[in-house]
Swiss-Prot record:
Protein's name in the database: Peroxidase 9
Protein EC: 1.11.1.7
GO BP terms: hydrogen peroxide catabolic process
Cofactor: binding comment: Binds 2 calcium ions per subunit. Binds 1 heme b (iron(II)-protoporphyrin IX) group per subunit.
Family as reported in the entry's similarity comment: Belongs to the peroxidase family. Classical plant (class III) peroxidase subfamily.
One GO MF term attached to the UniProt entry: lactoperoxidase activity
Species of provenance: Daucus carota (Wild carrot)
Keywords (A to Z) from UniProt: Calcium, Heme, Hydrogen peroxide, Iron, Metal-binding, Oxidoreductase, Peroxidase
Cofactor(s) the protein needs: Ca(2+); heme b
Catalytic activity: 2 a phenolic donor + H2O2 = 2 a phenolic radical donor + 2 H2O
Disulfide bridge partners, by residue number: none
Amino acid sequence: GQNFTSDKDLYTDSR
């Protein structure tokens, strides 16, 4: 899924 920490800086996904 999409797990955004703050903005679109650090996101844990399979991108």
